[in-house]
Amino acid sequence: EIKEDLLGKKTGRVIYRDNLTVFQTSGGECRFINFLGMDWHYAVSSQEGVNQYHVWFVPEVAEMLDQDTVYLAAFSLEKQAIKDHSMILHSAYMCYEDTAVLFSAPSETGKSTQAGLWEKYRGTWTVNGDRSLLIREEDGWYANGWPVCGSSEICNNKSYPVRAIVMLSQAKENRISRLKGLEALRKVMEQITINAWNSEFQIQAMDELEILLKEVPVYHLECDISEDAVRCLEDVLAGGRGEE
C-alpha cells in the first residue's frame, strides 16, 4: 500500500540502480531500497519536506541498522550532510598525533589493515574502520566519527583536524606519491558517497572537494603489510613531500 501510494505521487522520471529506485514527488525525493540480487524492497524513504522524511523498514532488517549500506541509504544522510559542507568518505580513520589520517580505497584493499599496522608499530588508534564524516569548519577540515563502521567493528565518536588523505593500493614494494589536480579529485570522489542521479548534489560535492583538495594533501600509498609501509607514510607525514 505504501509503495503504490508513493508511486502515485511521482513526478519526472524514475531512476533504477542495482539496489535502488529513485524518483521525485512533490515533497522531494523518494527511494525504494533493496539488496543486490533481491527483487523485494527492504526499506522506503520518502522526503516530505526540506528536513522531513518518513522511513519504513520491513521487520526482517530491524537488526541490521548498524550496517552502513542499510543505515545510509534509508536515511539519505549524505543529502543532509552536503548542505552543511560535509561529506562521507569511505575510509579507515586513524588518529595520529591528534590529527586525522584517512586511509581510503575500494573495499577489500586493506584500509583497516594499514590502520592496524600503525596501531601495532606506532601506538596510534583507529576512530572508525570504514567511514569518516568530513566537515568544513572556519579553521579547516575535520574528520568526525560515523555511527556505523562496516565489518571493522571500530566505531568511535571523535573529531580531529584532517592531516592527510591516503589512497591505498596493494603492492610488493612500498612507495608513496603526492596526488594533485584531476587525479586527486577523481580518486577521492570515487570514495565519497554521492547521489550520481542528482546534478545539484554533484555540483555541491565538486565545490566542496575542490576546497578540500586545496587544504588537505592527498597521497597514493602503494604498500604491503609490513612495518616498512608504515615508515614510508611516516616519512611524508613528518615533513617529506613524497615522490612528485
Task: Indicate where each model-derived feature is located.
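A noncatalytic interaction/capping subdomain that flanks phosphate/NTP-handling catalytic cores
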Residues: 1-102, 107, 117-125, 132-244
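Conserved glycine(s) of the Walker
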Residues: 109-111
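Hydrophobic positions on the alpha1 helix immediately C-terminal to the Walker A/P-loop
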Residues: 114
